[in-house]
Amino acid sequence: MTTNEEFIRTQIFGTVFEITNRYNDLNPVGMGAFGLVCSATDTLTSQPVAIKKIMKPFSTAVLAKRTYRELKLLKHLRHENLICLQDIFLSPLEDIYFVTELQGTDLHRLLQTRPLEKQFVQYFLYQILRGLKYVHSAGVIHRDLKPSNILINENCDLKICDFGLARIQDPQMTGYVSTRYYRAPEIMLTWQKYDVEVDIWSAGCIFAEMIEGKPLFPGKDHVHQFSIITDLLGSPPKDVINTICSENTLKFVTSLPHRDPIPFSERFKTVEPDAVDLLEKMLVFDPKKRITAADALAHPYSAPYHDPTDEPVADAKFDWHFNDADLPVDTWRVMMYSEILDFHKIGGSDGQIDISATFDDQVAAATAAAAQAQAQAQAQVQLNMAAHSHNGAGTTGNDHSDIAGGNKVSDHVAANDTITDYGNQAIQYANEFQQ
């Protein structure tokens, strides 16, 4: 970037996009998780990119934490089959923008336009499994794997995106988020104790959809979803039923008539045996018996592309210590600014914290920085009040009323200005970075 670079403001679907003039030719391409996505051209590289605006990241502590989680994941997960963070910046309006490569289309759109030939199904599944092997090795579960979250370019390179909903690999995990068609049965049955196997189930559903050109389990609601799964797999085995924690769910499942499974070779008669065998290993009721991503890569169906020396795992587990933290917005804000500065390898900013420190130490430093900002803001407000009082000593009562109202405004402005000091260098990097 050059020192004369500046932020340019434009409207996209009624939403303000405020980006540096490094990027031009903005066009909306859709909504991602909690943000609007536009295509653009990077004038430094002349390459197309996708720019995702995070909507109001500091409006609530929940949104701030969610944005922090997505940023941390994008910085940590670096793999050919995962969307890659190329740039991140904070606008003067304090919106956050993620810049990634632009893939052109997604699997959902592709499946709507044409049936996939065998070699494309095989190659796309291989890349999905390759990406999942890496993600799972980092201790991360995607949780929302579906065709629209699988991006593809004109060279058939595939990348998994939207890690905004990803969660820690934790056998006590609760809740569900995935789109119903691709949701693993253990999520519907228990809402807890699920692990990386939920992504394998989702990948299996996507595999079947690529083969047939339509969703395998298009449930209209939870009950119908479970019903059509049992149409193919039969009734869940007793060891799965025994894991159901919800009394109402247990009563529902045990009240259903017994169903025998349909052999996959009968259900998918025209599909090659290796594909049927792998699909059957991915779509297993018991998650403990479901094939892993690593084993699926070694399956005969993946043989044309399988290369054990080129299917990497993560260098380190992702640090989830922040996941249970309940912090105020200003603390998340300081931590977010520091992550942005670290991405651009800019150090030494006032208020910047050491992101290599333990999470507890980061929180302590960020909390202290936020408190210092509030103290500075309060001091500035008092100075403003003193100045107004001095300047307005000879004014009328109405004038004093106006000044008092103005003090409320300047209180708010001063607080915002001071806390934003921690982001000043994140904004200013536009004038310093990549010179």
Swiss-Prot record:
Q: Which residues bind ATP?
A: V29, G30, M31, G32, A33, F34, G35, L36, V37, K52
Phenotype for W332R: Activates HOG1 in a constitutive manner, without the need of a stimulating stress
Control of this protein's activity is summarized as: Activated by tyrosine and threonine phosphorylation. Inactivated by dephosphorylation via recruitment of PTC1 to the PBS2-HOG1 complex after adaptation to osmotic stress. PTP2 and PTP3 inactivate HOG1 by dephosphorylating Tyr-176, while the PP2Cs PTC1 and PTC2 or PTC3 dephosphorylate Thr-174 in the activation loop.
Q: Which GO terms describe its molecular function?
A: ATP binding; calmodulin binding; chromatin binding; MAP kinase activity; protein serine kinase activity; protein serine/threonine kinase activity
Q: Enumerate the CDD domains for this protein.
A: STKc_Sty1_Hog1 (cd07856)
How this protein is processed and modified after translation, per its record? Activated by PBS2-mediated concomitant phosphorylation at Thr-174 and Tyr-176.
Q: Which reaction does it catalyse?
A: L-seryl-[protein] + ATP = O-phospho-L-seryl-[protein] + ADP + H(+); L-threonyl-[protein] + ATP = O-phospho-L-threonyl-[protein] + ADP + H(+)
**Principal localisation:** cytoplasm
Record note on disruption phenotype: Leads to sensitivity to osmotic stress (induced by NaCl, KCl, and sorbitol), actinomycin D (transcription inhibitor), galactose, sirolimus (rapamycin), UV irradiation, and methyl methanesulfonate (MMS).
UniProt modified residues of type Phosphotyrosine: Y176
Record protein name field: Mitogen-activated protein kinase HOG1
